[in-house]
Amino acid sequence: MSAHASTSAAANEARGRRSAEDVEYSKTHFRVCRFITETGVKLGMRSVPMATACVLYHRFFQSASLQIYEPYLVAMSAIHLAGKVEEQHLRTRDIINVCHRYFHPDSEPLELNGKFWELRDSIVQCELLILRQLNFQVTFEHPHKYLLHYLLSVRSLLNRHAWSRTPIAETALAVLKDSYHGSVCVRHRPQHLALTALYLALQTYGVQLPRGELEWWQVVCADITKAQIETIMSELLQLYDMEAKCT
């Protein structure tokens, strides 16, 4: 085998290893964000604080390694920090007990012993680490408000019966919620993510909107292109493929 062929084979093998590692990392992040949303529901978190917790998690791991930091500890700290950022007070003890029950559904709540206080200290220290890693930039603009605006615009283009018989709003909101399971939520502008969630919901139910000189999505969001919509939509659909792999 020539030197060039050997080098090419080695490069392909390295790419294959990286690709396999990327898939495993994506699976881990998906599972951890599912953990955030499920524990968030049990803690009574509102949708925006839960979204903030997921964004904190994804932002942290944009520059941190899964091989160094325990993802579920980062997630617990992200939940704790998100409650502060979004002004929804969450007791540390409640977070610990709900998360403990997630992993040990048949066990009793942790007693206030050494194990509890050790975990509490770890959450607090990891929260400080997240703050430093993100340079204390922990307030984010979420796509929810944009989606509500776009829904009103689209609703005005449909007749009342067409709107009422298709769950466009519910589906778009569900897609938006699901987007936080992957890093798609931090790779794109919030208004672009909101519009694509609505675009996907309309496509799902085959709803056609009246056409004018511009497409409806050009009217409601002038700075997005069809290529960007397709890119984001592809990333969203990949999350649903990931869900099947993580069950």
Curated annotation (Swiss-Prot):
One of its GO terms (cellular component) is nucleus. GO terms for biological process: regulation of transcription by RNA polymerase II. GO terms for molecular function: cyclin-dependent protein serine/threonine kinase regulator activity. Keywords: Cyclin. It comes from the Eukaryota. PANTHER family: CYCLIN (PTHR10026). This is Cyclin-Q. It comes from Danio rerio (Zebrafish). The gene is ccnq.
